[in-house]
Design a protein with these regions (language model features):
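Sec/Tat signal peptide C-region and signal peptidase I cleavage site
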Residues: 20-24
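Positively charged n-region of N-terminal signal peptides that target proteins for export
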Residues: 1-7, 395
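Short, charged, amphipathic alpha-helices and their helix-cap/turn boundaries
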Residues: 137-148
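Second-shell loop/turn segments in exported
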Residues: 60-61, 125-133, 151-160
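Activation targets extended, charge/polar-rich intrinsically disordered C-terminal tails
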Residues: 26, 148-337, 344-395
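Cleaved targeting-peptide boundary
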Residues: 25-36
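Bacterial N-terminal signal peptides
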Residues: 8-18
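Glycine-rich catalytic cores of cysteine/serine-nucleophile enzymes that process amide/ester linkages
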Residues: 47-124
Length: 395
């Protein structure tokens, strides 16, 4: 409560431009009393009265941190205030089922900078600061805008696609700018990537996370993103803002100030989703000749488990971007339900899977990625298991 009170008090101080003298005391984030005087000795129009910057944290190793994180840092040296305004969800570590159900909420938090950096230092993730070159009136308005969102609390459903950390920063700054515009470089409009393209490009260090993310993300993330709508990834936001201008001046500093040194990234190693998919495909081909039922049952169990999860996401979950997913064709619980009568439907279903694999591969080669290659190979392995159940193989 003290933190929120301090921030709201500072907002009031920023908005009041008095010519009278009033003695006051406020408390900074270190808990120290700071004597202030409302008089002409405090120049609220000075450019350094409020210092605004963009903070970007290195990617983590789990689903919710694999793309990194971005937040805004606002400082008022005169009054000893220094906060990170970070748009975050409720803790997901022990609430995975709530996450899959779409029950987690999001909100804007005001966190003292030292506390914010300590979290990333503990995780071995670097934090980099880029100064925002904004007019003082915009920086004061930005602080007011952020305070309002902090006061709203954690009230919005978790939505990584429409309310991710990077894209909300864009919205906050645009709101503070008012009629002023961010002039982006023409290169931002030369390409229209999809959300899936952006995730694939920025998760080469975490292939298993990308593999799982493709199961969670439906067709909504496959729509082309135009202009600043594609600034979903923190590092992409940095690159775009380093080339952008406001009032003819560069928006972002070109070189960062390192607040936390990051540790070297560790890749997934040799056992990747692609290796697993190739292994399953080889075993499926070999089992056409071996005729062992154990592999078929193992594949059916895995397909059913994934299929139940996929069906839940599409039909029952409120998680964003799960309304439809092309992976529902190969992954659903229907094969298990009708397994006893498989010789009657196995051949046409194998044909459906073959068409699906061909279509997904063609789309990927064409450049419109809907699934990963590892998913396609895995479905091919499942196709061979289904084909083995046809009258051609069943005696």
């Amino acid at each position: 409560m003290n933190r929120i009170f301090n921030i709201l008090l500072l907002t009031l101080l920023l908005l009041v431009a008095g010519t009278f003298s009033v003695s006051a005391q406020i408390i900074n984030e270190q808990g120290q009393y700071v004597d202030t005087v409302f008089n002409d000795h405090v120049d609220r129009t000075a450019d350094d009265f409020v210092i605004a910057s963009l903070l970007v944290a290195d990617p983590g190793t789990v689903m919710y941190s694999v793309l990194g994180h971005a937040c805004l840092r606002l400082q008022c040296p005169v009054f000893g205030m220094d906060y990170c305004f970070s748009y975050e969800s409720e803790g997901v570590q022990n609430r995975v089922l709530d996450f899959l159900a779409g029950k987690l909420m999001m909100g804007l938090f005001a966190i003292p900078v030292e506390e914010y950096c300590a979290t990333y230092r503990k995780e071995g993730r670097g934090v980099y600061e880029y100064t925002l070159n904004l007019p003082i009136e915009v920086k004061r308005e930005l602080w007011r805008v952020l305070d309002e969102h902090v006061a709203e609390g954690v009230r919005l459903p978790y939505d990584y696609f429409h309310r991710g950390c990077a894209i909300t920063i864009v919205d906050f700054v645009k709101e503070a700018l008012g009629e002023m515009m961010i002039a982006y470089d023409d290169s931002l409009y030369e390409h229209t990537p999809t959300g899936r393209d952006l995730v694939k490009t920025n998760t080469t260090h975490a292939l298993w996370v990308r593999f799982v993310a493709c199961f969670l993300a439906g067709n909504e993330v496959d729509e082309p993103l135009i202009g600043d709508k594609q600034l979903l990834i923190p590092i992409d936001l940095v690159r775009a803002w380093q080339q952008a201008k406001v009032n003819g001046k560069p928006l972002l500093a070109s070189e960062p100030n390192i607040l936390v040194d990051g540790e070297p990234k560790v890749n997934d190693g040799w056992f990747t989703p692609m290796v697993l998919s190739i292994l399953l495909l080889v075993l499926a081909v070999a089992n056409l000749f071996w005729g062992k039922p154990y592999f078929d049952w193992l594949m059916l169990a895995a397909q059913t488990l994934v299929g139940c999860g996929m069906t839940y996401l599409i039909c029952f979950s409120d998680l964003c971007c799960t309304e439809w997913n092309w992976l529902i064709f190969p992954f659903n619980p229907l094969p298990l339900i009708f397994w006893h009568w498989r010789k009657h439907w196995a051949l046409p279903y194998a044909g459906v899977l073959a068409i699906w694999c061909f279509a997904m591969a063609a789309m990927t080669i064409w450049g419109h990625v809907l699934v990963d290659w590892s998913h396609i190979l895995m479905v091919l392995a499942w196709l061979l298991v289904v084909f083995k159940q046809t009258k051609i193989f069943l005696k």
